[in-house]
């Protein structure tokens, strides 16, 4: 009984596409990160502004835009497009954006998996490949040797079936005689989007077509035509001598025919070419033909199927190539592996014969392939590496997606978006591209006409016209080294080529390893006061590989910069008066003693004793007004007006206590405890008194809880003379006791407006004229509202609601209609901060929660929320608004300070001036992420692997791996016969260990290992060093493997290190620790994993697990061992228990006993998982195991010796299997925070953290039986009753795998991403669900949600909330 939740959303961009999906006003960039769909607005200046974001319930495999064939353009000749998503094994979802509801609607769903399985005997691949016809008329989904074609409706054509046309006409005639509803239905049927799909086995395309490597729709044909790259007989390097050229290529025309019930097709093979190299893997269509990408070569075939030329790319190019023109470009030494990305640059309208294709290799280098043709004759074929510069894309590798955003052929500039598996996604601008292209002599290919090409690659019965295809040299294999006949020049511009990175989207994937340790709480005191992030623990992980590898710290809360610290004796609230361009006075009040004080900021905060400020009363609010020439003070019963020297001008007394004040020059809005309001305007001429503003008469019938003065254009369409104007108007805004929000202007004429749906927290809200209900039932839940703009460079307007229970809700103003607000239920994943019905009184007791809007907090417009756990609401340009805990100490009151800072008061009357820490910290994910680069340009450690935190010294140890050139040596060290050092060699590894001080993140000590070494694992463990006293010391254990070649057996070794304190280097106080080697031992076989257990340590060496003991003289002796089946990939310990994950044989559960020394196998899994990582799951004294395998499936197994059919626990019980959307790399056990502590009889709670290659981090939290039942019911209700984005079934996406039948169908792992949608439902919908759970279930459900939400507060041990 476990619950899965995301801690960090995926960050690796897997797919992207440009087009018009939500608007035609500007081009949109749609970005996919595993299961997150983001829609950005690109700006020419180089920014990406997030406009929409949605989270799906399944992994998105591919994305495409399908143009709408309708008259729905917005006057600029551009139509919106449908969005086509490929998910699962073989599923397509067609989506449309609804501007009225600001939501995505599902038009149609297409499931092909069952049809694919019945149409082929091969096992289906996990993901199908999506291809789109150039005109957007067809979508193709293929998996191995079976494909599905989905035709899109483009209107009835003349060549369609006559029956189909007549059938539609008869339907229209029949519908004209029926009701209006049915007439509309008939009209909808005529405007349908898709025709029936057709499933095709590859053998239907041609008798030899099988083992498909790639399929693409081709350009330049009147009918839909595909190119198929396939191998009639599977080949690999082992049988290359028998089948040297095993690959074929076919061009096939498809003639689709439609009927109501089915789609059929006729095929015509235009051309078929055989005997192509085995490493050719990808088809890149161009306007005049196709590029065939291979690992070692690139070939060009025209649209008639003639192979015209081949470029060799490296020294390993196939020596047996087809008999065509071969151009030697092997000096590039580049390899385009399967999955290499390419992008076709749009051609100039005046130069259709010139084409440029950008190719991206795995190292982040960009190559340009330029094609020039005259008719069908290829006259230019060349490849050039673009000189990007040292800093451009230097820390990025393995491109995962490429989209061209803008292409300006006139200026020869191109803006492209590139997503990387390792490194931040980048918007890259290429200026004067043609200046970097190597220009061949324009007639270099005209003299080469291969008269044998037609006979070799065309059928014998071809027409005589095929002789025109013989284009190249008489030589069978004319190798031409064109290094001497190429020139570096400019084609269209005299300006030099430059590349510029405009903006990056933060990526922390792939995550290699992680640990927990101190980052923001290294210093105990800051500026003489306790660190605001005191005792916080962060998740620190190693990310990326190669030059882009770095550390990432996942912070538990925002870590502010402390600029200054102050101490007060008596204070509960604070204000800062900004006068004449600077901070002049600091005003404090103490509500417990009913007194106020004023301090001069310029005079070292000395008390200001002049003037008539009311000091013997509690100040509710104080601010400047009247163009900063007057000061207004509101106490519990009075309003005072002063000049800048606190000379009093006027006083207004109130009969009831003031509870809330809002000031916006020249107005003051006051809410009284009786429930009525007062609005005053500063007299404009002399500014010495307030004038009362007349209020609408209907307000006398209402009970007001709070008020706000704001400026917005949301009521403009209801105001006469304004209409569609976007000019913001001043609005007096109120919250009533029946949870309505009302507005009126100064010139209201007794007309007020309301925000409909806010009382029930509906998904969408709209403004209308207010009408007094027949009965008002006071039941206030909304405490405070704000309507303001949030963001950094791009600011959007949001409605933010704070309830009396501490909940925070947020709505965004509609882009299409300013009088509407909407909430993105599918993506509104704000953390739970409170609960209704007093379900979480701890969150709001003691310190009042109040929202404070800060328009400039180091450039960000943010909202602070005071309380025991303070929060900050902020928004990055490329993300949604996020809610983060702000530090780890309470905040009682706060105010603006200077330019971009705030001053905050904690619960012990200390004041700190904060600014935002922007030192490589990203605030656009669920938690703040700090990027930490290790090393420098002079010392590049390449890939960072394992990371360990040393608790005693508070230092980090990181292993690194560098790629070195491989040397094929025998056991005696001599080079093997046949080794060619002049050719590019394979890569070997060289590893080491770094000791890092987190105060400066500098490497203070380093351990270098020999060549061909690899640090497989590293752990910090407390090892017993004295058997008599049982004294333990924290040691570092490092497991190493050495591998050279397949004929030499691998070896390994393990090292034990201590960290000792030394005298620091001069001027470097942080270098006061060094690594000290305690023990080292060589091992036969590699050491794959290490860990500590019961004061000893164990290692996996070859096919054994060996437990060793450290003696007093620092020697090490083995004390116990265990044989393992194949290879240990993961091993974890808990007390004296061990769980071992094998690469092929599942897991083993083992116990270790020290008296006598022995290892006892307690149980093992029946299923043979290919284990990647394993971890303990401890729940209420029961032992569970979390296993992740190579199929990205997470399994939960249980040790249950009391259950039948387990052979006293020898068979581990398979509880559930849960599909991950990405491959897991590592897991870690952490203590769980119990927000509602249970009885002391229960053992301590734990949770497991997992990290994936897509940059996501998740947690698996065990729960009690009663909690599981409540949450399971809520999840079922949401899945069954609520609409799912893209029509994906969350239950199917998570549980549909080959292990489903092994688990308990009624005890699956729950998905908290689904359950948490409960908090974003409307209040009546929530009530409807919890009523089915029984009495008082609402209270229990909210406590369950809060306990799961706050489980990671174990990283904040002193949190008082």
From Swiss-Prot:
InterPro entries: Beta-prop_RSE1/DDB1/CPSF1_1st (IPR018846), Cleavage/polyA-sp_fac_asu_C (IPR004871), RSE1/DDB1/CFT1/CPSF1 (IPR050358), WD40/YVTN_repeat-like_dom_sf (IPR015943). The gene is CFT1. Belongs to the CFT1 family. This is Protein CFT1. RNA-binding component of the cleavage and polyadenylation factor (CPF) complex, which plays a key role in polyadenylation-dependent pre-mRNA 3'-end formation and cooperates with cleavage factors including the CFIA complex and NAB4/CFIB. Involved in poly(A) site recognition. May be involved in coupling transcription termination and mRNA 3'-end formation. GO terms for biological process: mRNA processing; termination of RNA polymerase II transcription. The lineage of its organism: Eukaryota, Fungi, Dikarya, Ascomycota, Saccharomycotina. Transmembrane segments: none annotated. Residues 459-478 have a biased composition (Acidic residues). It is found in: Nucleus. One of its GO terms (cellular component) is mRNA cleavage and polyadenylation specificity factor complex. Its main location: nucleus. Keywords: mRNA processing, Nucleus, RNA-binding. The keyword RNA-binding applies. It comes from the Eukaryota. Residues 479-493 have a biased composition (Polar residues). Residues 455-493 are annotated as: Disordered. Gene3D superfamilies: YVTN repeat-like/Quinoprotein amine dehydrogenase (2.130.10.10). One of its GO terms (molecular function) is RNA binding.
């Amino acid at each position: 009984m476990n619950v899965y939740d995301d801690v960090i959303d995926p960050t690796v961009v897997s797919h992207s596409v440009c087009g018009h999906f939500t608007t035609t006003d500007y081009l949109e960039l749609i970005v996919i990160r595993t299961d997150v769909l983001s829609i950005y607005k690109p700006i020419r200046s180089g920014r990406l502004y997030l406009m929409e974001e949605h989270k799906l319930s399944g992994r998105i495999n591919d994305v495409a835009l399908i143009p709408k064939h309708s008259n729905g353009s917005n006057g600029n000749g551009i139509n919106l497009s449908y969005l086509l998503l490929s998910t699962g094994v073989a599923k397509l979802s067609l989506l449309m954006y609804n501007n009225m509801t600001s939501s995505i609607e599902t038009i149609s769903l297409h499931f092909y998996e069952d049809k694919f399985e019945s149409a082929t005997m091969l096992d289906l691949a996990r993901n199908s490949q999506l291809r789109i016809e150039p005109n957007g008329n067809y979508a193709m989904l293929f998996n191995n040797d079976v494909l599905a074609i989905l035709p899109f409706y483009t209107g009835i054509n003349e060549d369609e079936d006559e029956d189909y046309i007549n059938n539609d006409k008869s339907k229209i005639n029949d519908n004209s005689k029926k009701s209006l509803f049915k007439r509309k239905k008939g009209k909808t049927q005529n405007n349908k989007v898709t025709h029936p799909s057709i499933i095709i086995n590859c053998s239907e395309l041609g008798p030899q077509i099988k083992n498909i490597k790639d399929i693409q729709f081709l350009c330049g044909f009147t009918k839909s035509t595909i190119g198929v790259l396939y191998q009639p007989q599977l080949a690999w390097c082992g049988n290359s001598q028998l089948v040297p050229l095993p690959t074929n290529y076919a061009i096939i025309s498809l003639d689709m025919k439609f009927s109501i019930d089915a789609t059929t097709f006729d095929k015509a093979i235009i051309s078929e070419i055989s005997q192509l190299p085995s490493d050719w893997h990808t088809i890149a269509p161009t306007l005049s033909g196709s590029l065939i990408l291979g690992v070692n070569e690139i070939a060009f075939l025209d649209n008639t199927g003639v192979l015209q030329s081949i470029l060799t790319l490296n020294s390993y190019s196939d020596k047996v190539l087809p008999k065509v023109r071969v151009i030697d470009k092997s000096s590039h030494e580049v390899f385009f592996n399967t999955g290499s990305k390419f992008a076709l640059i749009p051609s100039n309208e005046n130069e259709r014969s010139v084409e440029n294709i950008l190719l991206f290799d795995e190292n982040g280098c960009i190559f340009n392939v330029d094609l020039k043709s005259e008719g069908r004759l290829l006259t230019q074929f060349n490849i050039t590496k673009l000189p990007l510069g040292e800093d451009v894309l230097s820390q990025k590798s393995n491109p995962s997606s490429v989209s061209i955003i803008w292409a300006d052929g006139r200026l020869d500039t191109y803006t492209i978006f590139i997503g990387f598996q390792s490194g931040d996604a980048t918007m890259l601008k290429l200026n004067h591209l043609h200046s970097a292209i190597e220009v061949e002599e324009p007639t270099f290919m005209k003299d080469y006409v291969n008269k044998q090409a037609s006979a070799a690659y065309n059928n014998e019965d071809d027409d005589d016209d095929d002789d025109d295809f013989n284009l190249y040299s008489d030589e069978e294999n004319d190798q031409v080294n064109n290094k001497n006949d190429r020139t570096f020049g400019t084609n269209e511009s005299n300006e030099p080529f430059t590349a510029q990175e405009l903006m990056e989207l933060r990526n922390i994937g792939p995550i290699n390893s992680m640990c927990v340790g101190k980052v923001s709480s290294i210093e105990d005191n800051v500026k003489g006061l306790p660190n605001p992030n005191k005792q916080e623990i962060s998740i620190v992980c190693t990310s990326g590989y190669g030059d882009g590898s770095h550390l990432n710290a996942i912070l538990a809360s925002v870590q502010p910069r402390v600029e200054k610290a102050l101490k007060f004796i008596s204070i509960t609230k604070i204000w800062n008066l900004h006068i004449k361009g600077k901070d002049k006075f600091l005003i404090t009040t103490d509500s417990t003693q009913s007194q106020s004080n004023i301090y001069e900021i310029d005079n070292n905060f000395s008390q200001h004793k002049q003037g008539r400020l009311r000091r013997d009363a509690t100040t509710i609010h104080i601010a400047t007004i009247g163009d900063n020439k007057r000061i207004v003070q509101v106490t519990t019963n009075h309003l005072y007006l002063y000049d800048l020297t606190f000379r009093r001008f006027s006083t207004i007394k109130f009969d009831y206590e003031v509870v809330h004040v809002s000031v916006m020059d020249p107005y003051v809005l006051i809410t009284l405890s009786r429930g009525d309001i007062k609005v005053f305007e500063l007299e404009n001429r002399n500014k010495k008194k307030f004038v009362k503003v007349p209020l609408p008469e209907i307000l006398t019938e209402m009970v007001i809880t709070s008020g706000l003065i704001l400026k917005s254009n949301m009521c403009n369409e209801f105001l006469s003379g304004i209409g569609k104007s976007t000019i913001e108007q001043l609005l007096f805004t109120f919250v009533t006791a029946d949870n309505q929000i009302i507005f009126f202007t100064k010139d209201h004429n007794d007309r007020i407006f309301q925000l409909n749906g806010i009382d029930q927290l509906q998904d969408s809200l709209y403004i209308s004229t207010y009408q007094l209900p027949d009965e008002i039932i006071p039941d206030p839940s909304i405490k405070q509202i704000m309507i303001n703009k949030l963001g950094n460079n791009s600011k959007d307007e949001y409605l933010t609601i704070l309830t009396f229970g501490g909940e925070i809700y947020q709505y965004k103003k509609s882009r299409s209609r300013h009088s509407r607000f909407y909430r993105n239920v599918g993506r509104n994943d704000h953390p739970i901060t409170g609960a209704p019905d007093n379900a979480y009184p701890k969150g709001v007791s003691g310190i009042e929660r109040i929202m404070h809007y800060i328009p400039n907090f180091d450039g960000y417009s943010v909202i602070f929320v005071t309380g025991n756990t303070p929060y900050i609401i902020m928004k990055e340009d490329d993300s949604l608004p996020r809610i983060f805990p702000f530090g780890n100490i309470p905040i009682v009151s706060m105010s603006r300070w200077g330019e971009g800072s705030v001053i905050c008061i904690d619960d012990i009357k200390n004041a700190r001036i904060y600014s935002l820490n922007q030192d490589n910290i990203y605030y656009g994910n669920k938690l703040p992420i700090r990027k930490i680069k290790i090393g420098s340009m002079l010392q590049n450690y390449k890939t960072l692997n394992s990371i360990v935190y040393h608790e005693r010294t508070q230092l980090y140890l990181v292993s690194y791996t560098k790629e070195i050139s491989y040397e094929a040596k025998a056991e005696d060290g001599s080079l093997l016969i046949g080794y060619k050092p002049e050719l590019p060699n394979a890569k070997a590894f060289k590893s080491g260990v770094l000791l890092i001080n987190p105060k400066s993140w500098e490497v203070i000590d380093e351990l270098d290992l020999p060549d061909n070494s690899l640090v497989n694992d590293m752990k910090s463990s407390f090892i017993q060093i004295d058997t008599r006293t049982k004294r333990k010391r924290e040691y570092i254990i490092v497991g190493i493997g050495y591998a050279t070649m397949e004929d030499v057996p691998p070896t390994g070794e393990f090292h034990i290190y201590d960290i000792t304190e030394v005298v620091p280097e001069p001027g470097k106080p942080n270098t006061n620790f060094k690594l000290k080697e305690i023990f080292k031992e060589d091992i036969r076989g590699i050491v794959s994993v290490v860990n500590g257990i019961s004061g000893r340590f164990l290692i996996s060496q070859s096919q054994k697990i060996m437990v060793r003991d450290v003696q007093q003289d620092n020697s090490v002796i083995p004390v116990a061992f265990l044989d393992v089946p194949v290879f240990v990939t993961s091993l974890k310990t808990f007390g004296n228990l061990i769980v071992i994950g094998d690469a092929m044989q599942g897991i083993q559960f083992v116990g270790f006993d020290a008296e006598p020394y022995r290892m006892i196998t307690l149980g093992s899994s029946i299923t043979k998982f290919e284990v990647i990582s394993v971890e303990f799951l401890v729940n209420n004294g029961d032992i569970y195991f979390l296993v992740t395998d190579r199929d990205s499936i997470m399994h939960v197994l249980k040790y249950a010796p009391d259950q039948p059919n387990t052979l006293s626990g020898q068979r581990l019980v398979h509880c559930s299997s849960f599909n991950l959307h990405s491959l897991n790399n590592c897991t870690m056990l952490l203590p769980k925070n119990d927000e509602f502590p249970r009885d002391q009889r229960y053992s301590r709670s734990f949770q497991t953290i997992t990290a994936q290659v897509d940059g996501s981090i998740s947690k698996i939290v065990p729960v009690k039986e009663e909690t599981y039942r409540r949450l399971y019911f809520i999840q079922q209700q949401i899945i069954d009753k609520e609409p799912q984005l893209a029509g994906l079934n969350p239950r199917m996406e998570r549980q549909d795998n080959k292990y489903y039948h092994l688990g308990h169908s009624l005890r699956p792992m729950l998905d908290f991403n689904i359950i948490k949608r409960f908090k974003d439902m409307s209040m009546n919908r929530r009530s409807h669900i919890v009523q089915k759970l029984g009495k008082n279930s609402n209270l229990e459900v909210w406590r369950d949600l809060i306990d799961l939400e706050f489980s990671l507060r174990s990283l904040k041990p002193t949190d008082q909330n």
